[in-house]
Structures are given as C-alpha cells and as structure tokens.
C-alpha cells in the first residue's frame, strides 16, 4: 500500500503581522480535516514574507507566522510533536519582486500534510 499524496495548503497574512487574513481563517477547518483523516500525520508549516524590511526581520516574521499557524492547529487538538515549523522569510517568493516591494501573496505559510 502506498502512502497518500501530500495535501498542500496556502494561508495568507495581514501586513507585517502573524494574523491570518479573514479568507485564510476560513480554510483552517479544511486543513484540520486533512490532518485528522490520517492515522499518524506529518505536518510541515513554512512561513514566508514579502521583501519589505530587512532579511533578518523577515526570517523572524516568517517563523512567527509558522508558529501562529502551529498554535491554531494545536489549539484544535493536533499534537505539537506532529507539526514541524520553519521560515524561509523572503528567500522563496511566490511572486518574484524587487527588494522592498509589498506583495500580499508573498505573506503566507505553506502547509504540507502527509
């Protein structure tokens, strides 16, 4: 029996914040359903930012965003040990931009559930 394909989710954040957008908050139940369907899930949450600000601050903000999502999942009953978090900061842009460019689609976390 082969393992199921990982499910991928993308959540977006408000400017310079670890608060999810209203639209992204609506996606949380879908993520929880994907996690709870699996006997022993592995969840990877990677935080990202746009290029406003310096790289070090953006790396920290990306981690803060990933930890915020982990907190939402843990509060919903997912074991913390099942969730890995990391930050790419501004290093892995969804939408390529010049430095110091505001781009809401880059303010995100990428979630993989398998």
Task: Kindly give the residue locations of the regions a language model identified.
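Periplasmic peptidoglycan-binding/tethering modules of Gram-negative envelope proteins
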Residues: 1-42
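Periplasmic OmpA-like peptidoglycan-binding domain that tethers envelope proteins to the cell wall
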Residues: 46-114
